Amino acid sequence: IVSMGGLYEFYMLMEKVGFKPKKSAAMAVGSLIYGIIVMYSFGEFNFAYLLFIFPLLVSLVALELFRKSKDPVTNIAFSVMGILYVVIPLSIVNFFAYDPTYYNEMDINTNNYSSLLLVGFFVIQWANDSGAYLFGSLLGKYKLFERISPNKTWEGFYGGALLAVITGIIFGQFDGAVIHWIIVALIIVIFGTLGDLTESQIKR
């Protein structure tokens, strides 16, 4: 539901700025791809099923042939981009919740499921956003990328990173992998910020 809702919002945003992705077909393809990846993460599908993802994406190209459009290449690009940008990342999230290798090593009796990693990632992202907003509002002076996002500042970026790392250290107390959580926090800070800038650029 979240995946399809996010994909729908992405396509609506693209339509507002003048593009025409094949919304209905792309959402149908996106739901199938999401299902395949999720079932693979559960161990219900083997790797061979993942090979169906490519022809499903190619089907969007074929369907565009039956629609009269002034810019079919751009429409195809944004139809596929929505799936790559929204559906696949959200489907991969399931691997963090169902990771028997990790949880067995941590001696956590979860029946192959635990919310530790998943909750940790989201809380770190929230800490990064909150820290960026707080430090940016109070101390913000130097713009991070004014042309794309006028409100983002370097002070906010570093403040968000600090709070994210502290949050990562806290989660590291649960499994003893403090260094790993710090690395995860830094990755979230960098790519979370890049994601925000990319979204701001699309909106503009």
Where are each of the predicted segments found?
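Transmembrane alpha-helical segments of integral membrane proteins
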Residues: 58-62, 194-204
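Membrane-embedded alpha-helical bundles of polytopic integral membrane proteins
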Residues: 1-153, 157-186
